[in-house]
Amino acid sequence: MRRRNLIITSDSDSDDGGGGGGAATASTPASASASASFPSVSGGGCGDGWPSPQNPRSVPVQFPSPSSPPPSPPIEISDEEEAEAEVVVEEEEVVVVEDEEEEYEEVEEIEDPDGDSPFVDAPEHISPPPPPPPPARTPMPTPTPTPTPTPTRPPVPVWAAPLPARTPTPTPSAPPRAAAPSPAGTPSPSPIPPSSTPVSALSGPLRQVDEFLRGLGLRLRPEWLESCAAGVPGFYGLGGVEAMARRCFEQFLFADMNACGAGVLPEGVGSMHNAVLDGPLVLQVDEIVNLSAPLRERYRDAHAGPKRCLKLSMTDGIQRIYGMEYRPIKDLEVLAPAGFKIVIRNVHIRRGLFMLVPEVIEILGGVDDELDEARNRLVSEVNKPPRGKRKQGGLPLSSRATLAAWPTNANATNDAEQGASVPRTVNTPHPTRLGNASHASQVGRTTQPMVDNLIPHVVVSNAQEQSRHIQEITMQGQPTSLNRHNKEASASYRYNAQCSISGTTRAMADEHVLVSNAQEQSPHIQEITMQDQSTSLNGRNKEASASTSYRYNAQCSISGTTRAMADERVDPSFVGNNVHEQMQRVQGITMQDHISASSESKRELSVTTPSGYDSRLAPHGVGNTGTRSGEATRSSNVDDGINNIGHPISLCGENEKPFTYIFNMLADWGVQQDTVPYIQGKIKGLITSVKRFQYKQSMQYDLYVYIDDGSFITEAFVDRDIVQNMIGLSAEELAAALSSGGPAQANIRKTMKAFEHFLVNFEGTILIELNRDSSVPIVREMNKGCSSSDAWQLLRRVKTFSGQGYMRSLDFMDTTP
């Protein structure tokens, strides 16, 4: 039998309805059974495949649509109105066409292999098909399957007997398919009521509490209830079952339902379709995601409205189910704490997905600390500023966010190869607190864990161990020619040895821009200094004084030579594993070089961190704490190359370093913001992306970019003069040229394309400024590329780190993922 569909078309030009009436008369027998279900196919009903009210299906209520009007009643054609069937609504004509040329999208899902109509009215008593397949009836509750070991005729009346009693109960069963009678596609019948579940083996009061909570839609594990009762003082004396249940419920709000929930959802809820769960059902929301936004904007606050669609990941402790915000729910927030609890009643299910509307959900509150911390790490990773086109550990953003939320171990968050980089020192996309003292303290806290990995093992860890090494050097490393001097000379030598070790320590720490034990070393150095100076002042022997001066200069030479050798770091084996080997190697060089190195003795007692930028408001912001003058004259290959090139910034004036780091500038600005109006510094970095570029509204250039120098990623404002010099026009002239048209407009577009290309590929030195009036750094100068002197300086640092084998743990230079 060929299937026929009823199609209604309007014909305003027809003179009479004879043809249409004949067609209607002919189609009456074929369309009589399909008229009740016609709106679900053509979209006249609810439009989502639901049966019409005339069809006694298992679902009693249609799913409410938020935007469509109420469903119109289906068009029915009876035998009494065959003559008037052509007059329907505004001269509509009933035409019967065959299904060979017309295809519908929704018919494909429910096609019937036998050729009959796929919509069949369910009879009052559902009976199994003539060959009753036993697997198709397995979901139906049977009294006992033991009397019928094989599928024979006796089980048929046994199954048919309880069916009339179950017909009033709505079951979320899918439409019957003759081609797929397997039980796997049939969802579970109705949700199991709490009273039908077996009661756990609990004590008398706790059993009553468990039954009371089940009546509210909450099932908890017995061991959790017992631990809760044991942890609450005076639990059994609260005065009744309701009071004890309330106290357990309060504790449950701040617990993880994945560990304490016993499951309240029916089995196989994820495979249900066209079903309604009455509830109440208490669930936990582990995560909320805004599906209407891209990944980088998915974890940002968005108000409830037609443009927002939230996806909720929920659990009852046993099963995980997902819900979709079908209509705006004002009580739900994108950034709600993870692990809060909700109650759901009368929720509709489509393809295993809960369709959430304001009427079916109620927020109970609560939070799970572990889930919330993981979610905060994920949000921090997703909301980081863009990194440009550099590799991100070979992982996409979604995978890196997952690793950030649940790191495998404590070191995974600091490993750049794993892609998880949440604990790094990267600011938020909207840095508005650069000048706060709290920000400076945060930078200091972030710096502290890095110090232990950056200072090499050759640097003595604390003052006590350093003092012990100095005494051993004093007893073993004195030249034999100096043994004739008195006790004062020996004390002075110890002082000079201390100065040498502190110089070596300071040189290694300067290259890492951090000093881990300056506070511990300074008091000890001062103590030795005061003691040795008093010894020198009490001495009256002129020869002893001369030898003291000689040894002081010699040891300063040891310090300078050691620092130069550490800077070059070509041979890793040169640096010994302890101070004894280092001093024995350097003493031979020192005895020949002490005269030329005597000029280095002025700066040996200070332990400073070179910042490389001007905190005293110099015009170009390069500070006075750069490389030392003797460093370039004694170092071999690399430093000789620097001498031959000659850089006006790094080798003139007060011998500044070529560039500094944003990380250091932020730390220093947090300390000096109350005393100086601004600070400036040069960095070596690149522009990762452009955040905003406007010129029409305010008739002036507003260009915000993200810059990265390897230590920090921050938003920065580009000076308007730089933009105007690059484009060659003011903002007003640019707007007028773009709106004029003609050749001028084409030329301006080429200029803008060139400026865009410059920003995308920029990498060089940037002069930035931090002041009180701006919440973000200001770019004052931009010079693409770098000089050869800067490259040599950077190469020296890289060779220093690689020679010691610490590149893998060097988080200070690799803080961006």
UniProtKB/Swiss-Prot annotation:
Residues 1-203, 595-639 are annotated as: Disordered. Residues 625-638 have a biased composition (Polar residues). Residues 126-157, 165-175, 184-196 have a biased composition (Pro residues). Residues 77-115 have a biased composition (Acidic residues). Belongs to the RMI1 family. Essential component of the RMI complex, a complex that plays an important role in the resolution step of homologous recombination, in a process called Holliday Junction dissolution, to limit DNA crossover formation in cells. Component of the RMI complex, containing at least TOP3A and RMI1. This is RecQ-mediated genome instability protein 1. The gene is RMI1.
